Every structure is written in structure tokens, then in C-alpha cells.
Amino acid sequence: MALSTLNREVIKKNLQNEEYDVVIIGGGITGAGIALDASQRGMKVALVEMQDFAQGTSSRSTKLVHGGLRYLKQAQIKVVAETGKERAIVYENGPHVTTPEWMLLPMHKGGTFGKFTTNLGLTAYDRLAGVKKYERKKMLSKKQTLNKEPLVKKDGLKGGGYYVEYRTDDARLTIEVMKRAEENGAEILNHTKSTDFIYDSKSKVRGIEVQDLLTGEMYEINAKKVINAAGPWVDEVRKKDYTRNNKQLRLTKGVHVVIDQSKFPLRQAVYFDTEKDGRMIFAIPREGKAYVGTTDTFYDNDKTKPLTTQEDRDYLIDAINYMFPDVNVKDEDIESTWAGVRPLILEDGKDPSEISRKDEIWEGKSGLLTIAGGKLTGYRHMALEIVDLLAKRLKQEYKLTFAECKTKHTPISGGDVGGSANFESFVERKVEEGKAIGLQADVAKRLASKYGSNVDKLYNIAQIAQDKDLKLPLELYVELVYSVQNEMVFKPTDFLIRRSGKLYFNINEVKQYKDAVVEELAKLLNYTQSQQNEFTKEINIAIEEATRGNEQLAVLK
């Protein structure tokens, strides 16, 4: 049926009339992964997300599927081993949203990593994470380090480590996982809030009450089991249940800044320590920009809208100018920013960066299953663990049996390209097909690289659109229409922030075409005038918040 906004009413009707094996609360990467795993095993799955997919934490990360080198420093061996192996699986199943990226780790006198510890750490990392032979670490001299990135601070430089991480588009990874779950039969809806639980006569959870936040409509979804995968909202969801353990979340905030490469001509991804507190942060080139982050501070304010403060901006500017002294970045050079919250499990007495990124599953007396903590990279394994438990409970309580987990070798939506080894030749072939229908080679390459095996649908839209009088560039129009028809975009922010990433990496294009995007969506989705006004205001606020230092307190008073 496709994960289409145009199918909202049909999906809503199904959600009201069917009974599901499981209903999942939360449409970030964790919920998406669970929906994929459960549906792949043959379970009847429903999922609701109160905002847009990936709007919480899953669109606001450092955009790396990585093995977590820094966790070696904290002796979190299991985390390194598991996430290192998982990142290879994520890449193989979705090479259109994940790309290997060589990372430079400069070693300076008095820095976090010396030559011995870097060599030892990266060797252990290679072995624990099961790194492919051609991607194993290299140790570089001072000269070799500067050849890789001439902007790195020369004073005290002793050399560098060189190892592979995987760059991703976190929000697109989430939507592609979600689309594959829908292809398996999962019923999925965004902008739909879980408001309460439904219980049977034995006080066991048997579904949820929800509200469509676009229409105000309330209805029930019946299910044998409920999984709470609400990320930062896990505790709020559990509070609606009558049973809960003494565990709770501790949120921390992470901020990234984006600078044009004309000002910060970074040619190489770099992982470096800051002067102020010795924390490790990333500087990564992407699409003509360089983005830098992340901060790590305790946060207890509005979870739906964590903002970048002036203090956050200053911290990252200082970090850039410390490691790249010739750049001399100023506040006005920052084009865009994003802030996100990490839903970590509380560990008393620990600083933000010391709290473990491990995940945990909690089971209430009501039967409610909750998954908390975890990392973007580990989403598939987290899903495997909780769906194994779900299958066990469905067998015990309902005598139902399901297949084992299959997601290790399941391409996500767009990933049917013949594996990572064939992705480059797949893109080349699709570029030729795009040129044959009149697309510019660079446009065809961007579309094929971004959408993988789904690109034919975008080409079909492009062919129809070529004869139209468009207010948008053809490429932008094609992506917009596709996102409505296949990725459940309803609001301009859904598209301009999460499906395209343009608010972060091409904010000038957002400023130029935002009104035309609103107009096009109004036509496609029959906005009321009040909706059109509201959504125009929403994107203008998003632009303002991304481009300035905000005065948001870390703790809500």
C-alpha cells in the first residue's frame, strides 16, 4: 500500500478495526527496527508516532553508524564489540544511507590519546568490532597526518590514527527501515499520540488509546502486547501504566553546528579532543559543509524542542579554533545547528559523558514491554532482543509461534542494490537511465545515491513533472512528491528537516523555496488555510531556531 500520507484514512480505519500481535509506541529508529523485525517474523504489527518519524532523537545524532571507539576508554567492551559488528550489517543492508568514512585521530602532546594508547586502542577496536581487513587502522606520522588534513593544529602534533567509521543520514535510515516494515504488512502512522493504555479483566495491557494530532480524532488500537519504544518519552509513557520499576531515564543534550566549507575547508573527517574539558568530538565534511559536534550536557526541559544555546555555540567554536587554529571560525560563520536529547538510563553520580549508552528491556506486571537507552548503531540488535522476548510471551500466553529473526540479511527499503559491493555500479547504471529520461547527470546521481532501489519511483515522478510549470527546482519537486506518496510527509518540516536534511545542510535553499514547498503541499494534501498559515509559521520558527543562539535553560523551572 506504501507508507503514503494519501493512505492515512485507510490506515486509521485498519488500526481501529484490527487486533494486532503488537502495537509499538514510538517512531524513531528503535521503534522502526522493532516493527521491521516483528513484521519480518510474521507478526501483525501496528506502530504510532506522536510527532514525525525520527523527530525526537533519531534525526539529531552525529549521523554516524559507528563502533564507539570512545567506549574503549570507559572499558565498555561489550558495547564496542556489538556496535562494531552491527555497523557492518547496517551498511550491507542499506548502502544508500550509509557510507564508509575514514576518520583521522590526531595525536598531540598532552592529548587524550598518545601513540601507544592510540595504537593499542585502534588495534583492540579492529578486533572487537570485526573490522574488514582493508578497513583496519593505520598509524600515521606527523607529516602523513597533515597531508590528510592540513588544517589540524601543528603545535605538539606527534602523528595520527586512521580508522573507518560509517557516515549515515539518521532520519533517512529510520524512514527506510520503517518503509520495509510497512512492505511486510505493518500498519504505521505518524502524528498520532498514544494517550492511555487499554486493560483486560486481569489488568493486562491489551492495547492503547490514541489521538490523531492532525484531526483531533480519538480511537483505540487493540493488541495482544504493547511495546514502549518512545525514546526520551519512555518514562512519560510508563507513568500511564499502573506498574513500573525504579529505573528511570537521564537525558543529556548534544548539539552540532554546520559551517560552509568556504569558511572551514575541511577535507577529512576528524575525531579530536577539546581544550576545555578533554571531551572527544567530530568534525565531518558533508555536501559542501563541515559539521562539528557534539556537546554533552544534562537536560531537563522541553523534549520536543531542545535548542542550541549561545553557550553551546561558543563551546563548539572554541573547540574548532583550538584544533584548527588557522580557520578562525566566528559565531556568524555558523549557518545552521541542531540539538537532540539522548535517552540514557540514570546512573547516579556520573557525568553526562560517563553514563553508559547500553540499552535495557523492562517488563511490567501489566505485560507492558519497554526498551530504553541504546544507540543508533545498535537498533537492529536491540530489536532482535525485544522481539525475541515478545515472541516468547506470545507463545506462552497465546500459543503463537513465529520465525527466528531474519533482519541480519534483510535489505532495508531502497537497499535492494545487490549489496554494498555492487552499489557503485548500481548508481552508475541508474545515472545513465536518468540521463535517458532527460535528467542532468548530477541530479540523477544524487537521487540514485540517496534513494537506492527506490529511485525508479522518483524517475517516474520526474518524467511526469518535466512538462509542468513548476515553482520548485525539478529535483526538489520530485523528492517532495515522492515523500508524500511514500514517506508519509504531511508538514513542510517533515520534508525540509527529516526527509531531506536541507534545514541543516542547505538552509539557503530552504529559505528560498519554503513558501513554494508549503504551496505545493497545500495542493497535494488539501490544507485548510489555517493549516497553511500554521505550517508556514512552523518552518519559519525552525529556521530561526537553527540559526541563532537560543536562551533555553537546561532545566525547566
UniProtKB/Swiss-Prot annotation:
Residues annotated as binding FAD: 21-49
Gene Ontology terms: biological process: glycerol catabolic process; glycerol-3-phosphate catabolic process
Family matches, as Gene3D superfamilies: Alpha-glycerophosphate oxidase, cap domain (1.10.8.870), D-Amino Acid Oxidase, subunit A, domain 2 (3.30.9.10), FAD/NAD(P)-binding domain (3.50.50.60)
GO cellular component: cytoplasm
Domain of life: Bacteria
GO molecular function terms listed in the Swiss-Prot or TrEMBL record: glycerol-3-phosphate dehydrogenase (quinone) activity
UniProt keyword annotations, A-Z: Cytoplasm, FAD, Flavoprotein, Glycerol metabolism, Oxidoreductase
Pathway(s) the chain acts in: Polyol metabolism; glycerol degradation via glycerol kinase pathway; glycerone phosphate from sn-glycerol 3-phosphate (aerobic route): step 1/1
Catalyzed reactions per annotation: a quinone + sn-glycerol 3-phosphate = dihydroxyacetone phosphate + a quinol
Subcellular location(s) per record: Cytoplasm
Pfam families associated with the record: DAO (PF01266), DAO_C (PF16901)
Cofactor section: FAD
EC number: 1.1.5.3
Family designation: Belongs to the FAD-dependent glycerol-3-phosphate dehydrogenase family.
PANTHER family in the cross-refs: ANAEROBIC GLYCEROL-3-PHOSPHATE DEHYDROGENASE SUBUNIT A (PTHR11985:SF35), GLYCEROL-3-PHOSPHATE DEHYDROGENASE (PTHR11985)
Name by which UniProt lists this protein: Aerobic glycerol-3-phosphate dehydrogenase
Upper lineage: Bacteria, Bacillati, Bacillota, Bacilli, Bacillales
